[in-house]
Amino acid sequence: MPRSLRKGPYVYYKLQRKVDALNESDEKKVIKTWSRDSIITPDFVGHTFAVHNGHQFIPVYVTENMVGHKLGEFAPTRTFTEHSQAKVDQRIRKPGQ
């Protein structure tokens, strides 16, 4: 559900302070964060964030297309494990063939 327009976008204040400090000094360092729910603002473009996925930190380089999305959208929390093809073929084959 979208956030109310009168409230504005949510950005963790400490994260915003770190980005502002890096923008003033023109540095490009990786910013480590647990704040997956912070919305990406135009100030974040060009920075790399290490977003925690519950197990490890995933590096996310922010581009202009990501503005308005949340940081957590780009650091998946679940790993997809495929079904092995041999087991799938066994299930499809009918007994007696």
Curated annotation (Swiss-Prot):
Keywords: Ribonucleoprotein, Ribosomal protein, RNA-binding, rRNA-binding
Domain of life assignment: Bacteria
Coiled coil: none
Family to which this protein belongs: Belongs to the universal ribosomal protein uS19 family.
Role summary: Protein S19 forms a complex with S13 that binds strongly to the 16S ribosomal RNA.
Cross-referenced HAMAP family: Ribosomal_uS19 (MF_00531)
PROSITE patterns from the UniProt entry: RIBOSOMAL_S19
GO terms for biological process, alphabetical: ribosomal small subunit assembly; translation
Alphabetized GO MF terms: rRNA binding; structural constituent of ribosome
InterPro entries found in the cross-reference section: Ribosomal_uS19, Ribosomal_uS19_bac-type, Ribosomal_uS19_CS, Ribosomal_uS19_SF
Organism expressing this protein natively: Salinibacter ruber (strain DSM 13855 / M31)
Cellular component annotations (GO), alphabetically ordered: cytoplasm; small ribosomal subunit
Protein name per the record: Small ribosomal subunit protein uS19
Keyword Ribosomal protein part of the UniProt annotation: yes
UniProt entry tagged with the keyword Aminoacyl-tRNA synthetase: no
